């Protein structure tokens, strides 16, 4: 009975190649957490298998933080797959490169941003500008001429 459903034309629909190898854009996005502490913004981005030389972090005009990464073997692997007579059956692992842009708040110290990679997680620490001192209000006694 299962052969009736999973065999023939249904097998091709259910298990066939739904998308060509380039179904995803060249730049996929990476999962990210963004938390704000009293002194900084902390971004943690999943970069499995990438080291510090495989990730580029920069701030563009308008306080846009850009993070890009690519596996060192990605280009060579991609070329080998194009040269061979390769048939893709499943493509679930995503692309070996990614890009992520984050609009940072205006009150950050761009020149003090730090980034590090550890166990497949890129951590970017963006220090905040200190809050401006609140103006102190002091009552002034008003006298009248009598």
Curated annotation (Swiss-Prot):
Molecular function via GO: unfolded protein binding
Sequence ranges assigned to domain sHSP in this UniProt record: 23-143
GO BP terms in the entry: protein complex oligomerization; protein folding; response to heat; response to hydrogen peroxide; response to salt stress
GO CC terms: peroxisome
Protein name: 16.0 kDa heat shock protein, peroxisomal
Keywords attached to this entry: Peroxisome, Stress response
Superkingdom of source: Eukaryota
Pfam families with a match to the protein in the record: HSP20
Subcellular location: Peroxisome
Gene source species: Oryza sativa subsp. japonica
């Amino acid at each position: 009975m299962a052969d009736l459903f999973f065999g023939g034309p249904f097998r091709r629909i259910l298990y066939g190649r739904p998308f060509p190898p380039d179904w995803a854009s060249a730049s996929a996005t990476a999962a990210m957490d963004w938390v704000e502490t009293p002194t900084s913004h902390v971004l943690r981005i999943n970069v499995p298998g990438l080291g510090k030389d495989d990730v580029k972090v920069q701030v563009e005009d308008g306080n846009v933080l850009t993070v890009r990464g690519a596996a060192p073997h990605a280009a060579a692997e991609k070329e080998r797959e194009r040269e061979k007579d390769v048939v893709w059956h499943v493509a679930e692992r995503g692309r070996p490169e990614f890009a992520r842009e984050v609009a940072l708040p205006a009150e950050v110290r761009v020149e003090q941003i730090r980034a590090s990679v550890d166990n497949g997680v890129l951590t970017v620490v963006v220090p905040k500008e200190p809050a401006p001192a609140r103006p102190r209000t002091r009552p002034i006694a008003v006298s009248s001429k009598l």
